[in-house]
Amino acid sequence: MDFQERDPPFLPESAQSSKPSSAQQASELWEVVEEPRVRLGTEGVMPERQEGHLLKKRKWPLKGWHKRYFVLEDGILHYATTRQDITKGKLHGSIDVRLSVMSINKKAQRIDLDTEDNIYHLKIKSQDLFQSWVAQLRAHRLAHRLDMPRGSLPSTAHRKVPGAQLPTAATASALPGLGPREKVSSWLRDSDGLDRCSHELSECQGKLQELHRLLQSLESLHRIPSAPVIPTHQASVTTERPKKGKRTSRMWCTQSFAKDDTIGRVGRLHGSVPNLSRYLESRDSSGTRGLPPTDYAHLQRSFWALAQKVHSSLSSVLAALTMERDQLRDMHQGSELSRMGVSEASTGQRRLHSLSTSSDTTADSFSSLNPEEQEALYMKGRELTPQLSQTSILSLADSHTEFFDACEVLLSASSSENEGSEEEESCTSEITTSLSEEMLDLRGAERCQKGGCVPGRPMGPPRRRCLPAASGPGADVSLWNILRNNIGKDLSKVSMPVQLNEPLNTLQRLCEELEYSSLLDQASRIADPCERMVYIAAFAVSAYSSTYHRAGCKPFNPVLGETYECERPDRGFRFISEQVSHHPPISACHAESENFAFWQDMKWKNKFWGKSLEIVPVGTVNVSLPRFGDHFEWNKVTSCIHNVLSGQRWIEHYGEVLIRNTQDSSCHCKITFCKAKYWSSNVHEVQGAVLSRSGRVLHRLFGKWHEGLYRGPTPGGQCIWKPNSMPPDHERNFGFTQFALELNELTAELKRSLPSTDTRLRPDQRYLEEGNIQAAEAQKRRIEQLQRDRRKVMEENNIVHQARFFRRQTDSSGKEWWVTNNTYWRLRAEPGYGNMDGAVLW
C-alpha cells in the first residue's frame, strides 16, 4: 500500500529538547490542525467536492513521490492513478479525513493525514491549490463535527422487536398435528419469524456501522492535543494518549471495520459494555476531577446504549432461529419423517442452513414442491441473504478509514486464507454456535445444499469425512536434487518420489471440477441466455477453488489405459475419465446429467523455472445444456506454484478465459485471472464481464477464485458462487475438500463393479492414502516399469494404443479432440466388468 510508516509530525509544544536548532526549526514548521470548533450559523454549510492531482509519497524511503488523482467528497478522500480509474471504481485507497489527525506544513506545502495505522504524505505544488485543499479538508472535518450530536444515535436503532413477538412454543407444537406435506408447507409459509429476523439483522448492520463511527470518534478525541486525560484506573475503557514516537493499539479493536467481520465483532463489543458501565458509575462517583468534556461523555453513553441494543437485537434473532431449529428437529425426529419425501427434508434443511450462513446463493432446485411452496421458500431465502453477505460487508468499506493496497499478502497464500468465507461465516458466529450440533446431525442434507445435490434424487450412502491416515511431511525429500537437472524440462516425463504426491489421480482431479455442478443445474433452468452465461462463468471459476490448499503436493500421473468412474446420484451426474495418450499425456473425461453434459480432453506442460513450477494446460472444456441446445466451450489458464524449493508454497492462476456459446452468438464472456504483482493487491483476483455481440457489458463479474464470484458493481454485488467451507483438519488430509475426500473411497460393493483399470484399485495410490510410504514408493516404481515394458513391446510390434471408452475426432482444420464412445456404462451394466478381462496395468 502507498504509505510510509514514521512518527507523527512533531507538535510545536513538544519540540523542546536538546536536539540541534535545525531539528527544532524543522519540527516547528509543522502545524497540527486542531479539531474544528462548532460555530453558530454554520449548521447549513455543506462542504464542496474537491478533486485534482496531488503528489503522494511512496511507500519505501528515498523512493520519492508519485502523482495520484484525489477526490474529496463527504469527508472521504479517495485516490487512484487517474480520474478514469476513480470513475471506474479502481481505487488505490481511501482516507476518512474526519477521523484523521491532520498536520500541515505551509512552507513545504505539505499535508499529512494520520489515521493512526498509516500516515499519508501529500504535497501540493501551487500555493493557491494548497490553500484550497486545506480549506476544503477543514470544511469536511467541520461538517462531520456538526453532524456528531445528531448522528450519535442511529435512525435504525429506534425500533426494537419485543421478544413477545417471536414464535411461541404453541406455534411449534401445532405443527406435529399436521400431515407431512402440510407440515412442511405450513412451516415454509410461516414467514413472520423470519421477517423479523431479516429486519433485526438489517438494523443490526446499521447499528454496527454507527458503533464503529462512535468508536473512531472516541479514539480521535482521545489522541488529539485537547483530549482529556483519563485516570489509570479506567484503563479498561480507554488508553493513555501515545507520546511522541510511540504508537499504541486501538482501544477496543485492532483492525478496521472494512477488514473485520460484521456481527462477529458483537462478541467483543458485548465484552466492552460492562467496562463502559463500570466506567460511567465510577465517573459519577469520583467527583469533578478528570471528567471528560461533554461531547466525550456523550459519545461514551451513546456507544454503551447502542451496544446494548445490538446485543438485545441479536438475542431476539437467536431466539427466533432456535425456534426454527426446534421445529426442524421435531419434524426430523417424528415418525412421519420416514414417509416424507427426501426432497422436502432436504429443502427444509437448506432453508435452515441458509439462515445460519446467510449465503447469497439461490437454492438449486425446488422441483419437489408445488409452485406456491417454491415461491415462499425462494422469497424467504432471499430476504436474509443480502444483509449479511460479503456483498453488504464490502459495501460498507467506502465509508471507513482503512483501505489498503496490501502487497504483503503476495508473499504467502495463507495470509488471506478463506477471507471471504471467514467474513461471511463470522457474521453469524454467535447465532450458529448453538445450532452446530444439530446441523452436524443433519450434515447429509447440508452437504446436499452446499455441494450441489438436487432435491428429489437419492442421497446415496454416507461418505467418509477423513482419510485413513494423516498426510505425512515431505520435507525430507530434496527437491533441489531432483529438479536442478531438469530446469526447463517437461516434468511430466520426470519420475518423482511418492512423498510429493497426494492420494488422488489426475483423472480424479478432472472429476473434482464438478464439485459445483449445481451451477450447471441452475444454468439449465434459466431462460435468459446472458444469465445462463453468468452461471457458466461461475462454474469455470469454481474449478480452481480446491487448489488453494493443495500447493504442496501433486496428483499421481495416470498410466496409459487407466480409467476412473464417479457415479453420484445425489448430485445427479455420472462421470468417466481415461488416459488416452501417454506421449503427450492426454486425459479425457465425460460427465452426463439430465440437465447438462460435460466433457474435455486436457494435456499439461510442466516447466520448472528455478523457484516456481508452471503448469500450462492445453485443451478445451465443453458444457452442453440440452434444454436450450447450448454448447459452451472455454480454455483453461496457466497455474504457477511459487516457492517450490523453500518457504511456504502457494499457487496462483493467471490468464484469460474466453467462454462462448457455439450455438448462440448473442453474448460471450471474458474472465481474467489476475497475475500477482508485488505492488498490487490483486492476488487471486478474477475480473470479467458478459458482453453482447457488439461488445457492450451486460454483466460485470468480480471476486477471487478461492473465495467467490460476484455480479454487479464493485465493491458490492450479488454473490453467484462461493466455495464450501473446508472440512475439519483439512491440513492433515492433504488440504482436500469434502468432495475430494470422497473421490478415492472404495467400498466392497463398488469394488465388484469397477473395471480392473480403475484408479481406485491402483496400489501405490492406495498405500499412500493409508500412510504406507515405503510400500507406495515400491509399487509406484513397479507400475512405472510395467508401463515402460508395455510401451517397448508395442513399439517393437508396431502396435498403436486404442482408447477403450473414448474416440478421437478431427475437424477440417486438423484440430483433434476426444469424445466418449458411449460404451462404458452399457458394459458396466451388461455383462459387467467383473465378467470381462481387462488390461493389467499394475
UniProtKB/Swiss-Prot annotation:
One Gene Ontology biological process: regulation of autophagy
Cross-referenced PANTHER family: OXYSTEROL-BINDING PROTEIN-RELATED, OXYSTEROL-BINDING PROTEIN-RELATED PROTEIN 7
PROSITE patterns: OSBP, PH_DOMAIN
Residue(s) carrying Phosphothreonine: T171
Similarity remark: Belongs to the OSBP family.
Protein name, UniProt field: Oxysterol-binding protein-related protein 7
GO cellular component: autophagosome; cytosol; endoplasmic reticulum membrane; nuclear membrane; nucleoplasm; perinuclear endoplasmic reticulum; plasma membrane
UniProt-annotated stretches for the region Disordered: 1-28, 330-369
UniProt subcellular location: Cytoplasm, Cytosol; Endoplasmic reticulum membrane; Cell membrane
Predominant location: cytoplasm
Record PTM Phosphoserine, positions in chain: S217, S226, S256, S272
Annotated tissue distribution: Expressed in epithelium of small and large intestines (at protein level). Expressed in stomach, duodenum, jejunum, ascending colon, spleen, thymus, lymph node, trachea and leukocytes.
Keywords, sorted A to Z: Cell membrane, Cytoplasm, Endoplasmic reticulum, Lipid transport, Lipid-binding, Membrane, Phosphoprotein, Transport
Compositionally biased spans, kind Low complexity: 14-27, 354-369
